[in-house]
């Protein structure tokens, strides 16, 4: 055993929600952070076949058209800061928050095809599991080097009620650290807003047998030890690659890639992100619900609300008569519920908000 396996785990275990699983069909692909609970009436999944390893996703936004802006950004910001205060708002963020950091989204013009892996496949198909880990190992150095953009930094300056993110890149936390460092010992500065990684985070790895968490860098090191010549064999420099939204890299041949087991129980290791058919930890759901329930309204930044994990917060707010603000330059599934709709770039809007 190397020193990697002697490192202390991050936390003891998770308690998981019970969420119905799904059967799916496809051939190849990478992990996608979406749980079975997010499959809506508009998301179709093909029947299970023995060789099928991935989910085929039909975009629930197909046919939707981006609405016009309901108000100017200045008018919306007046509502956020004068009719209410910053602390009244829960903020839900999606992939559009991170595109300016170089993290691609799922629906942009240059987005890769979406053939996401399911948790069932990860459990039962060793070849697909190794394929996933090879792609993830290759993409992690680039993803790890991603830095928060001005949207993250501006939002980190705002004392909002809390941030619920569907992203798995950890950039909200990085932005909070950068803002705190810039403020130094300013005793009058507001405390950082809580951040809930609804779909998990790529910087952690979880054992599917005992729930223990490990630091991703340590797992990355172990993967490198087990596969010292892999990058050279496939002819790709891990530092100079284009990653998919989940931080992995397209690879044609992953045969022979070796994946370590959990050092404590021999179980399967998986990045701590939620796959199709997987379930969101109950404690995480409760934390997100608490933020949304206690807020006076919700601001959606850079999310198409294509999956129910995000859309349900908007639906609940609208049902309770709370104001809904949506900011993104494309259509969303919540547009008809929005009281205030901006079609500006997320970074431009949040910067305007932070300056008021």
Each language-model region and where it sits:
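Extreme N-terminal basic, low-complexity initiation segments
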Residues: 1-16
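Extended intrinsically disordered, low-complexity segments enriched in serine/proline/acidic residues
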Residues: 7, 34-35
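Conserved catalytic core of sirtuin-type NAD+-dependent deacylases
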Residues: 14, 23, 27, 35-356
């Amino acid at each position: 055993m190397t020193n990697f396996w002697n490192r202390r785990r991050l936390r003891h275990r998770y308690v998981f929600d019970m969420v119905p699983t799904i059967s799916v069909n496809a051939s190849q692909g990478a992990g996608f952070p979406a749980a079975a609970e997010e499959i809506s009436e508009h998301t179709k999944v093909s029947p299970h076949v023995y060789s099928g390893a991935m989910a085929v996703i039909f975009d629930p936004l197909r046919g939707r058209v981006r609405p016009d802006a309901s108000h100017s950004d200045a008018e919306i910001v007046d509502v956020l800061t004068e009719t209410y205060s910053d602390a009244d708002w829960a903020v839900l963020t999606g992939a559009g928050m991170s595109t300016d950091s170089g993290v691609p989204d799922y629906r942009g013009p240059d987005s890769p095809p979406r053939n996401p892996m399911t948790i069932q496949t990860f459990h039962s198909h060793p070849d697909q599991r190794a394929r996933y880990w090879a792609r993830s190992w290759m993409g992690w150095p680039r993803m790890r080097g991603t830095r928060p953009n001005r949207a993250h930094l501006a939002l980190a300056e705002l004392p909002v009620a809390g941030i619920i993110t569907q992203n798995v890149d950890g950039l909200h936390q990085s932005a909070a650290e950068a803002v705190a460092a810039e403020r130094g010992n300013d005793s009058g500065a507001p405390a950082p807003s809580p951040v809930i990684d609804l779909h998990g985070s790529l910087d952690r790895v979880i054992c599917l047998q005992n729930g223990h968490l490990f630091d991703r860098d340590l797992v990355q090191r172990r993967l490198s030890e087990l596969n010292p010549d892999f990058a050279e064999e496939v002819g790709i420099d891990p530092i100079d690659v284009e990653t998919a939204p989940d931080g992995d890299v397209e690879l044609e041949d992953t045969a022979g890639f070796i994946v370590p087991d959990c050092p404590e129980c021999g179980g399967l290791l998986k990045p701590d992100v939620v796959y199709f058919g997987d379930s969101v930890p109950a404690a995480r759901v409760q934390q997100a619900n608490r933020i949304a329930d206690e807020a006076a309204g919700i601001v959606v930044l850079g999310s198409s609300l294509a999956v129910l994990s995000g859309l349900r917060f908007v639906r609940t707010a609208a049902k309770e008569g709370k104001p809904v603000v949506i900011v993104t330059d494309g259509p969303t599934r919540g547009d008809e519920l929005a009281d205030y709709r901006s079609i500006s770039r997320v970074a431009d809007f949040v910067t305007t908000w932070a300056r008021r």
